């Protein structure tokens, strides 16, 4: 599985990197295993390297400097429940990644055992994986050339495009012959496998170019017989339209999967914004796949007139007003659905208005009066996306009742200039690393340092006076999101108050003994009795009344970046199985201090695996040799995005 070689690094680095000749570093001639996870990066382009039509002044660029991302899978690959015939079925990778060429990625590659012993916790520089894409860019220097226009195709065509893009500007020298042979063999293997996108596509699925003959005929037969295409359930009724076309917006994007986690990153250097979505699915892949395909387009539409203006006329405004009624076939459905949705929307809007009012009445008044409108737009986008998902699931309930079990946590971050907008449902987190106030440092941080693993502390003690002082963490952790789980007393009390006649509303620290999170996208069996009744008896809960046990009402937060803000960690909850907020921030700070050219997200994944292995009494490689699915006993799927701010401020165009 995987590409014959790693994706050639295109992350641009500092001046030292530019002075080096481009080199190709091939670490292993064998195909890389993409099933474990991926590390990826995006570095803001140098304006001098961008065409004059796209050059923006420093005041017009995005606030962040770099994006480092990494994901590791613990669960096995699971096909969409709606797939009757799936030409992707032979692809059993639990992890995958694809992007435009402005991103660089490489599969996570454990250091070979033969390279020497790996002692968990031997110090901050201890390594379990080979270099990530950012570090490789520093070692080999940036490749010439800028990314071309976004191609509508994904999968194998894209990976081949990445190879050719890098090779066009590569100068190999005396090693040319042997390297060309390796590359030719790698590309040949990639083409032979006929790999295609195994992540839910941004646009509705097109017929794979590599499906021929009887398979193609069979696909057409199934498509004609299905009410909802089994190959593109996640794209059915897509919110995409001409306004949201990625090709027409000059956007750079990346999307990946790791087990049941999904990650989506969209960058607009032209308009100065960044979108990151992390979707932590459970009970199946359909819900996070649907979010991956639909939530960003919905957010983009809701933000029209707030963060962006349509240069075209509003001739299509009447069509946009009818987006919720886009599926004409649903008109024959019972009016009970429409009535329940109207009641739900009213409750959602009422709760949202109360939430925003409570925020405005708080001690820290929001300096941006527009922020409440932006946050409300994010919430409305999520509501419409879930309504569409549940409506599609309701249409397929007889054939695929398991859709009622599937759900996902949601973490969305939108950055526009100095403004950061957060929306979350579930227990994924956004944690900000800030320069701490002196009083705060003397008190809380010193206490938190005691919880840092003793191996790292021993490494501090082994440093000289000068070095040791520089390694002491100086940043505080500020969580921008709110956890929605049974670990939060307020959430438990809310559910019990809403279900006074049900003593088992929360039992065994789970909602109805089933779900740890108290809010989630999907999971219809905890929201309406009919979805619970559609399940096999062994999966049903004792549903009392008609009120939902969980909801999808998000927590919302606006933060104005300042000079003290250094980096932002966005992650699914798997990270915090082994890290506190303070430990995660301290780990990233320590890493970028010692290895400023490194990949902090990959480092966090690596340290998490070290801790999981140590807790289980095994070494790093032994843990990774445990098959996916069984390895879920030791750690969860984990997706991490670290956005470097470095305390610098750039203003985006408005």
UniProtKB/Swiss-Prot annotation:
Chain segments annotated as coiled-coil in the UniProt record: none
UniProt region (Disordered), positions on chain: 11-30, 309-336
EC number: 3.1.3.16
Keyword Chaperone on entry: no
UniProt cofactor(s): Mg(2+); Mn(2+)
Superkingdom of this protein's organism: Eukaryota
Keyword Ribosomal protein found: no
Any single biological process term in GO: leaf development
Cofactor binding note: Binds 2 magnesium or manganese ions per subunit.
Keyword list, A-Z: Developmental protein, Hydrolase, Magnesium, Manganese, Metal-binding, Nucleus, Phosphoprotein, Protein phosphatase
Pfam annotation, one family: PP2C
An example molecular function term from Gene Ontology annotations: metal ion binding
Disruption phenotype: Plants show abnormal leaves altered in shape and curling.
Catalysis: reaction(s): O-phospho-L-seryl-[protein] + H2O = L-seryl-[protein] + phosphate; O-phospho-L-threonyl-[protein] + H2O = L-threonyl-[protein] + phosphate
Function in brief: Involved in leaf development regulation.
PANTHER family named in the record: PROTEIN PHOSPHATASE 2C, PROTEIN PHOSPHATASE 2C 23-RELATED
Protein name: Probable protein phosphatase 2C 23
């Amino acid at each position: 599985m995987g590409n014959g070689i790693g994706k050639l690094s295109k992350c641009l680095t500092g001046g030292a990197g530019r002075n080096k000749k481009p080199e190709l570093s091939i670490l292993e001639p064998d195909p890389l295993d993409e099933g474990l996870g991926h590390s990826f990066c995006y570095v803001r382009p140098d304006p001098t390297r961008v065409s004059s039509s796209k050059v923006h002044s420093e005041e017009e660029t995005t606030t962040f400097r770099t994006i480092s991302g990494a994901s590791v899978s613990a669960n096995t690959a699971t096909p969409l429940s709606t797939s009757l015939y799936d030409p992707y079925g032979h692809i059993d990778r639990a992890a995958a990644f694809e992007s435009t060429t402005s991103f660089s990625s490489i599969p996570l590659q454990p250091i070979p055992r033969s390279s020497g012993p790996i002692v968990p916790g031997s110090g901050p520089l201890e390594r379990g994986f080979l270099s990530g894409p950012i570090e490789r860019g520093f070692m080999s220097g940036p490749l010439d050339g800028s990314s071309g226009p976004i191609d509508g195709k994904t999968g194998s065509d894209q990976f081949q495009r990445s190879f050719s893009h890098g090779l066009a500007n590569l100068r190999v020298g005396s090693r040319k012959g042997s390297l060309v042979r390796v590359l030719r063999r790698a590309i040949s293997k990639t083409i032979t496998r006929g790999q295609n996108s195994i992540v839910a596509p941004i646009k509705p699925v097109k017929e794979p170019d590599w499906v021929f003959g009887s398979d193609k005929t069979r696909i057409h037969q199934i498509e004609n017989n299905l009410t909802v295409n089994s190959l593109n359930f996640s794209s059915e009724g897509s919110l995409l339209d001409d306004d949201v076309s990625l090709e027409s917006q000059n956007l750079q994007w990346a999307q990946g999967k790791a087990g049941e986690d999904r990650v989506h990153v969209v960058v607009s250097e032209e308009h100065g914004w960044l979108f990151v979505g992390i979707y932590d699915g459970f009970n199946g892949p359909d819900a996070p796949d649907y979010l991956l395909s639909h939530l960003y387009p919905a957010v983009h539409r809701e933000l029209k007139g707030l963060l962006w203006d349509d240069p075209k006329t509003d001739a299509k405004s009447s069509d946009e007003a009818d987006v919720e009624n886009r599926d004409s076939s649903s008109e024959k459905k019972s009016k009970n659905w429409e009535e329940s949705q109207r009641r739900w929307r009213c409750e959602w809007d009422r709760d949202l208005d109360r939430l925003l009012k409570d925020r405005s009445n708080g001690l820290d008044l929001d300096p941006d009066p527009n922020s409440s409108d932006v946050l409300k737009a994010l919430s409305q986008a999520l509501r419409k996306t879930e309504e569409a998902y549940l409506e599609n699931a309701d249409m397929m309930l007889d054939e695929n009742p398991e859709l009622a079990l599937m759900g996902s946590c949601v973490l969305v971050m939108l950055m526009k200039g100095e403004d950061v907008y957060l929306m979350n449902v579930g227990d994924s987190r956004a944690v900000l690393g800030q320069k701490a106030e002196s009083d705060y440092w003397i008190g809380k941080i010193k206490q938190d340092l005691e919880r840092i693993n003793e191996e790292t502390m021993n490494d501090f003690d082994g440093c000289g006076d000068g070095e040791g002082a520089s390694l002491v963490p100086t940043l505080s952790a500020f969580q921008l999101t709110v956890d929605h789980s049974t670990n939060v007393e307020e959430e438990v009390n809310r559910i019990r108050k809403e279900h006074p006649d049900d003593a088992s509303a929360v039992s065994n620290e789970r909602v109805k003994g089933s779900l740890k999170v108290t809010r989630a996208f999907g999971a219809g069996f905890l929201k309406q009795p009919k979805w619970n009744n559609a399940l096999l008896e062994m999966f049903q809960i004792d549903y009392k009344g008609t009120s939902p046990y969980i909801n999808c009402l998000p927590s919302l937060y606006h933060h104005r970046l300042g000079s003290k803000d250094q980096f932002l960690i966005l992650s699914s909850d798997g990270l915090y199985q082994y890290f506190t907020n303070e430990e995660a921030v301290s780990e990233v700070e320590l890493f970028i201090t010692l290895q400023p050219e490194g990949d902090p997200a990959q480092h966090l994944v690596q340290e998490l695996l070290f801790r999981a292995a140590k807790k289980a009494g095994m070494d790093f490689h032994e843990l990774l040799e445990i098959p996916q699915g069984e390895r879920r006993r030791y750690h969860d799927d984990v997706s991490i995005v670290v956005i470097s701010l470095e305390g610098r401020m750039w203003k985006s165009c408005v």
